[in-house]
Amino acid sequence: MSWIERIKSNITPTRKASIPEGVWTKCDSCGQVLYRAELERNLEVCPKCDHHMRMSARNRLHSLLDEGSLVELGSELEPKDVLKFRDSKKYKDRLASAQKETGEKDALVVMKGTLYAMPVVAAAFEFSFMGGSMGSVVGARFVRAVEQALEDNCPLICFSASGGARMQEALMSLMQMAKTSAALAKMQERGLPYISVLTDPTMGGVSASFAMLGDLNIAEPKALIGFAGPRVIEQTVREKLPPGFQRSEFLIEKGAIDMIVRRPEMRLKLASILAKLMNLPAPVAVSEAPHEGVVVPPAPDQEPEA
């Protein structure tokens, strides 16, 4: 018998496990491989290092408002390429691509509903839509949110995540800074609370307008907040910036924001603050029914347990 015939027939090559796309993701901060379903249940906060990942506008609003109370506002408003703007790509093509990728018509989603049974209007930025940039539709939807809050005599909450004004709309995008700020002046005249929640990142024209005009400005941990980015500032002043510059922890030390709140604690914290400001009874934290255990499949670099 030759040596070829003596090869053991029961030896089979190792098969790589087939892992569907989107089941696993990696933490941007600590690099830990995380099970997507478990991460979503944890509101996109890494359970290993507490890094707050970016969250979609709809998921944020659904996690904030009481189930079954949400009504979307301003969904009929759509962006138009009035200037026929073109850089390396036509603006209308950028819009079509962003709409297909995110399922949103523009970068701001507005809903009214209840928060611990208290009527509120809430808005949230979709950063995946052209970097959460502010154009005419974002400004119009924000004003619609203010008008609804005035009509319902209730508070307004806005979660910002934006790179600033949308350059493809030129002066029309810059006009939204004044437009939104003027609308908020009406909230102040009526004595209705406006709470601004700054998430990572909140920059440019958004940070220079309604994002910093809250009766309370609350930030998530380690959120980048400012007007120009750190690299631009370093190139301008020709100096090395201090560690953590423009992060929420740096800003609270300088008195630029009022508090930092972790995302899992945000809902109850907002409800408690608004109840005080509206002279309503404090919300009672209801313990949720325990979730069924999530069956976590082995990570791509792990072997199944015997």
Curated annotation (Swiss-Prot):
It catalyses: N(6)-carboxybiotinyl-L-lysyl-[protein] + acetyl-CoA = N(6)-biotinyl-L-lysyl-[protein] + malonyl-CoA. The keyword Lipid biosynthesis applies. One of its GO terms (cellular component) is acetate CoA-transferase complex. GO terms for molecular function: acetyl-CoA carboxylase activity; ATP binding; carboxyl- or carbamoyltransferase activity; zinc ion binding. It is found in: Cytoplasm. Keywords: ATP-binding, Cytoplasm, Fatty acid biosynthesis, Fatty acid metabolism, Lipid biosynthesis, Lipid metabolism, Metal-binding, Nucleotide-binding, Transferase, Zinc, Zinc-finger. Zn(2+) binds at residues 27, 30, 46, 49. Acetyl-CoA carboxylase is a heterohexamer composed of biotin carboxyl carrier protein (AccB), biotin carboxylase (AccC) and two subunits each of ACCase subunit alpha (AccA) and ACCase subunit beta (AccD). This is Acetyl-coenzyme A carboxylase carboxyl transferase subunit beta. The lineage of its organism: Bacteria, Pseudomonadati, Pseudomonadota, Gammaproteobacteria, Enterobacterales. The gene is accD.
